Curated annotation (Swiss-Prot):
Primary gene name: rplI
Task of the protein: Binds to the 23S rRNA.
Protein name (Swiss-Prot/TrEMBL): Large ribosomal subunit protein bL9
Alphabetical list of PROSITE patterns matching this protein: RIBOSOMAL_L9 (PS00651)
UniProt keyword annotations, A-Z: Ribonucleoprotein, Ribosomal protein, RNA-binding, rRNA-binding
Length: 150
């Protein structure tokens, strides 16, 4: 019997996959527990339509991420963060990714989640830094951050 998996079933199939399984297994376990449904022509065409829509949305997200990357990596986009510093240009405390995200939103109206800003360690000195931002799993942008003393 052909079924469409509604969720991942270990050793049998992944969500959205159409597969031929034994009749008893399909009727008594997969369909009964809501893990799969019979693969009728209507169900298969609906699945293909859904997969097509998901692919279209993924392509739109990727295009949007690339536009945002060009906006972030523009030469004029330098995020300025002010912090208290000592005489040897070391900061009192540090600059975390949250503060960089807030400054980016205030200065350029670009909203980026703080978890997407990739700081190996917090910034602890004045000056310019290049910071990576993971906008999309396939798109990473680099922003210039200028740390200045208050």
């Amino acid at each position: 019997m052909k079924v469409i998996f509604l969720e991942d079933v270990r050793g049998k199939g992944k969500k959205g996959q159409v597969k031929d399984v034994p009749d008893g297994y399909a009727q008594n376990f997969l369909i009964k527990n809501g893990k799969a449904k019979p693969a009728t022509t209507a169900a298969v065409s609906a699945l293909k339509g859904q997969q097509h829509a998901e692919a279209k949305n993924a392509a739109a997200e990727l295009a949007e991420a690339k536009v945002l990357k060009t906006k972030i990596e523009d030469d004029k986009t330098i995020v300025e963060v002010k912090s208290k510093a000592g005489e040897d240009s070391r900061l009192f405390g540090s600059i975390p990714s949250k503060q960089i995200a807030q400054a980016l939103e205030q200065q350029y109206k670009i909203k980026v989640d703080k978890r997407k800003i990739d700081l190996p360690e917090p910034i602890k000195a004045l000056g310019y830094r290049n910071v990576d931002v993971r906008i999309h799993p396939d798109v990473t942008a680099t922003i210039r951050v200028h740390i200045v003393a208050e």
